[in-house]
Amino acid sequence: MRCPSLARLPHRAVSGLTRTPVRFQSQAFLTARCASTAALRSATPVHQSVLNRRYQQTRNASGTAAAVLEAAAQTPDSLSQEAIIENLDPVEAERLSRVRNIGIAAHIDSGKTTCTERVLFYTGRIKAIHEVRGRDSVGAKMDSMDLEREKGITIQSAATFCDWVKKDEDGKEQKYHMNLIDTPGHIDFTIEVERALRVLDGAVMILCAVSGVQSQTITVDRQMRRYNVPRISFVNKMDRMGANPFKSVDQINTKLKLPAAAVQVPIGAEDEFEGVVDLVRMKAIYNQGSNGENIVVKDEIPEKVRELAEERRRMLIETLADVDDDMAEIFLNEEEPTEKQIKDAIRRATIGLKFTPVFMGSALANKSVQPMLDGVIDYLPNPSEVQNTALDKKRNEAQVKLVPYNALPLVCLAFKLEESSFGQLTYIRVYQGTLRKGSYVFNARTDKKVRIPRIVRMHSNEMEDVSEIGAGEICAVFGVECASGDSFTDGQLGYTMSSMFVPEPVISLSIKPKHSKDYANFSKAMARFQREDPTFRVSFDPESEQTLISGMGELHLDIYVERMRREYRVDCETGPPQVAYRETISQRVEFDHLLKKQSGGPGDYARVVGWLEPTGKLEENQFEEQIVGGSISEKFIFACEKGFHLSCEKGPLIGHKVLGTKMVINDGATHMTDSSEMAFKNATQQAFRKAFQEGNPAVLEPMMKTVVTAPAEFQGDVIGLLNKRGATINDSEVGVDEFTVYADCSLNGMFGFSSHLRAATQGKGEYTMEFSHYEKAPPQEQRELVKKYLQAQADRHKK
């Protein structure tokens, strides 16, 4: 038998695992496993007639949960999501069916925060609507930083909890709980989007009705695919001049390569935008009231859009027939699908990552946001319908499934940290078990035991204290010292969540407070920002005696410098941007190095023999020992390995990290009294420096995947700008009124590009960059970098 709402569930493995076919398994499978579970064995047979019915049911339920947990750990591939759902406690199944963990993501300035503001208003989360650039601390809850309100961009992901009351077809009202996360659109804050998608079960992708799919929309799409997050689409700004929602639908199909079809058509557009026609129910929907809070549904579709609505409904059914077997059968039999059949097909295809339904409206004009919320309930999965995995540290990090049962041992993830007036606020997603106030949990990374003093949910203008949070929900806790991405358990399981994808920083700045009295606050700010943001790094360069901050781009670091000034009242001086270069060798070099210092008393003696060679890929460095006969003891080998890794932290060429280099030690010699771990560490470092210089060394520079979008008339100017910077153009797309160029550019060549692009395109061009890979810098640039480094070293020695 096929369950229409669960036919194609996403097999979501957060570490990018491949999807496997969904299999149904009966209760009998788990009953048999349950019977063999040691915890449930009994010396005497248990008879229903003897025991209290309720006690027996509770015992059976806990036994089934234990059996499911065992199957999830031992044979995760054979345990289907349907079997997990089938064996859910009925009360738990009802609770989870009413939960949605969703995010809102899109290109910058597509109206994410404006849309979220309406969602909060219509769900009763806030009492009045306030715009993105406003100064009201209530209305601008999702942009709570002054910096966000001034710049009109979202920097951090803001999380909130709200209730949405949806009317069923029979008119009965049902309350659903939504955990909603608003995310940044700017590429420099991409870690915020990664963190949000990591813990969400579904997303709303917002597009501009005028611009359609833009460069950052493509990045967000790639992130959603990485975490297998199903999404519905919302074409916003239908009241703007030049609004064309069907261009967005076409671009989702062509640019994002994702089948899409409109589930609504607009009644009017631009200044005359009145409402939408629901293509599933074939009814007209209008918003009334000063803030569009009243929904009016009419059976009569306006004559001016009737033909368009019928045509688009046919296209919706045809698209669904391409991605859903049941709808294909109905379509081939030339039958007219019912409203329920269309809804079920949309839900199956959306959750199966094969389709996205496209809604349309205008958040700023307070029109058609509520039908989009109904779409979240109808078409996005609840927590029990999504597969999540963890790693079992006790079994060599074997992959296990997480089961959203409250009765099972706790597994949860801290995905975001914030400072508040009450202390550190930690956002947590519970995947399995129950998180209770006052309970103790174990940090899987540090193995430290931590007490949970307070649990809150963001609700109705304030934090709502709760005593416990069940599986599948998101909450915030106070008083827990941890880092972003830490996993927590109750100690019964040795599970850790596979970590989020965290890109390496590509740009650095030297930074110091202008006034020495500010060093205490400066240190506090640095420590806090590092805990909150894994892509923000702080280091100290002992040679230049400078503190360096590293991040994803100029804006990323500028925001933190500005936050330090506003939140900690620390004015800072920053140096010019520094590129994160790397060093490597190009050929194999053998070495035989002797360190010998014997001038009376304890001396140093160490001889190391081996070779350096490139690994073939510009990835991690490798150390290997191939010693036969014990010429170097094991403790000295460890010292050699330590010396190698220390050498890789600061290369001989320009003082940057070494990449893609392998050291092999296959012989050596020791002295009975003068050999020590320190001597072998130093000998390895000296051998490394000498051999590295002989191995045809090279400087590597970071290459950035760059996407430039501008009006079509500026295509020649933009191509010229990229060519001047030595970019490699990989692809280009020319639309009706704009074009997009995809190129690989060196980060060093892209400094100042934004101002030149604005000048060349009359302020209409935009671009995004993200790290792609390392490759050798041009010879002239390498020579200049080496010369500059040697000069700096000489100047330092003179002092």
Curated annotation (Swiss-Prot):
Pathway: Protein biosynthesis; polypeptide chain elongation. GO terms for biological process: mitochondrial translational elongation. The lineage of its organism: Eukaryota, Fungi, Dikarya, Ascomycota, Pezizomycotina. Residues 97-384 form the tr-type G domain. Mitochondrial GTPase that catalyzes the GTP-dependent ribosomal translocation step during translation elongation. During this step, the ribosome changes from the pre-translocational (PRE) to the post-translocational (POST) state as the newly formed A-site-bound peptidyl-tRNA and P-site-bound deacylated tRNA move to the P and E sites, respectively. Catalyzes the coordinated movement of the two tRNA molecules, the mRNA and conformational changes in the ribosome. One of its GO terms (molecular function) is GTPase activity. It is found in: Mitochondrion. GTP binds at residues 106-113, 182-186, 236-239. Belongs to the TRAFAC class translation factor GTPase superfamily. Classic translation factor GTPase family. EF-G/EF-2 subfamily. Residues 1-24 form a transit peptide. Keywords: Elongation factor, GTP-binding, Mitochondrion, Nucleotide-binding, Protein biosynthesis, Transit peptide. Its main location: mitochondrion. The keyword GTP-binding applies. This is Elongation factor G, mitochondrial. GO terms for cellular component: mitochondrion. It comes from the Eukaryota. The keyword Signal does not apply. The gene is mef1.
